[in-house]
UniProtKB/Swiss-Prot annotation:
NCBIfam families: amanitin. This is MSDIN-like toxin proprotein 6. The lineage of its organism: Eukaryota, Fungi, Dikarya, Basidiomycota, Agaricomycotina. Belongs to the MSDIN fungal toxin family. GO terms for molecular function: toxin activity. Processed by the macrocyclase-peptidase enzyme POPB to yield a toxic cyclic decapeptide. POPB first removes 10 residues from the N-terminus. Conformational trapping of the remaining peptide forces the enzyme to release this intermediate rather than proceed to macrocyclization. The enzyme rebinds the remaining peptide in a different conformation and catalyzes macrocyclization of the N-terminal 10 residues. Residues 1-10, 21-35 form a propeptide. The gene is MSD6. Keywords: Toxin.
Amino acid sequence: MSDINGTRLPIPGLIPLGIPCVSDDVNPTLTRGER
Protein backbone atom coordinates (compact mmCIF):
# COMPACT_ATOMS: atom_id res chain seq x y z
CA MET A 1 0.00 0.00 0.00
CA SER A 2 1.87 3.04 -1.24
CA ASP A 3 0.59 6.59 -1.15
CA ILE A 4 0.69 7.19 -4.91
CA ASN A 5 -1.65 10.16 -4.77
CA GLY A 6 -0.25 11.21 -1.41
CA THR A 7 -3.19 9.48 0.26
CA ARG A 8 -3.08 6.04 1.85
CA LEU A 9 -6.28 4.06 1.30
CA PRO A 10 -7.18 0.63 2.69
CA ILE A 11 -8.21 -0.36 -0.84
CA PRO A 12 -5.25 -0.04 -3.26
CA GLY A 13 -7.67 -0.51 -6.17
CA LEU A 14 -9.15 2.93 -5.58
CA ILE A 15 -5.76 4.63 -5.88
CA PRO A 16 -4.91 3.79 -9.52
CA LEU A 17 -8.54 4.27 -10.59
CA GLY A 18 -8.46 7.82 -9.28
CA ILE A 19 -12.03 7.90 -7.97
CA PRO A 20 -12.18 10.56 -5.22
CA CYS A 21 -15.94 10.00 -4.88
CA VAL A 22 -15.53 6.36 -3.85
CA SER A 23 -12.44 7.10 -1.78
CA ASP A 24 -14.30 9.92 -0.03
CA ASP A 25 -16.86 7.39 1.23
CA VAL A 26 -14.06 5.18 2.57
CA ASN A 27 -11.73 7.76 4.11
CA PRO A 28 -13.28 11.25 3.93
CA THR A 29 -10.46 12.72 6.02
CA LEU A 30 -7.67 11.52 3.72
CA THR A 31 -9.50 12.49 0.55
CA ARG A 32 -10.13 16.01 1.85
CA GLY A 33 -6.41 16.47 2.22
CA GLU A 34 -5.90 15.26 -1.34
CA ARG A 35 -8.26 17.89 -2.67
